[in-house]
Amino acid sequence: NKFENQVKIINEDIKNYKNIFNRDEFDTIVTNPPYFEFTGDISQTNDLEQLANARHNIDLTLEEIIKISSYLLKNMGSFSIVFRSERMVEVLALLQKYKLEPKRMKNCYTKWNENSKICLLEAIKDAKKGFSIEMPIFVYDENRQKNEYIENLYKSSDLKIKKE
């Protein structure tokens, strides 16, 4: 996708960010953090440790992700996040706490007749106020067919990322 020379994969614990990166170093941060808040009850997680860490913020909280992102982003840098709709209030409060101004959001619906489970949100560091809720994404239509919009996303996302 012609970004091979602009993307560098770093396999490191994000909590070491101050040892690796400078403040205000990035123009854009995109994150798909664990969706579920960990309450301390291990029975709420999957038996497989990798899946538990991927689904529950056991080792890294949502607040840590947003705080670190704010530190790393340049002024007017873009922060994009995917999260569970049920955590909307928490996400908005944390973004504003760390000077990431919510700018636009899309709700995602698995089916046209169900509530939104996932939200996509973009915030800008140190931006002026102004927020829009964009047209939603429906994964499946009323005939249980994958939505044309989703099909086109899959077709256009032929990512080729080079690991270093």
What are these regions (language model features)?
Residues 2-19:
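Conserved SAM-binding strand-loop segment of SAM-dependent methyltransferases
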Residues 1-5, 97-100:
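Short helix-capping segments at alpha-helix termini
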Residues 1, 31-36:
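Amphipathic alpha-helical repeat scaffolds
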Residues 35-64:
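Mobile active-site "lid"/loop adjacent to the S-adenosyl-L-methionine
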Residues 16-29, 37:
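A short acidic, Gly/Pro-enriched loop at the edge of an enzyme's catalytic core
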Residues 116-164:
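SAM/dcSAM-binding transferase cores
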Residues 58-116, 120:
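Conserved Class I SAM-dependent methyltransferase catalytic core
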Residues 32, 65, 123:
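Residue-level signal for inorganic ion chemistry
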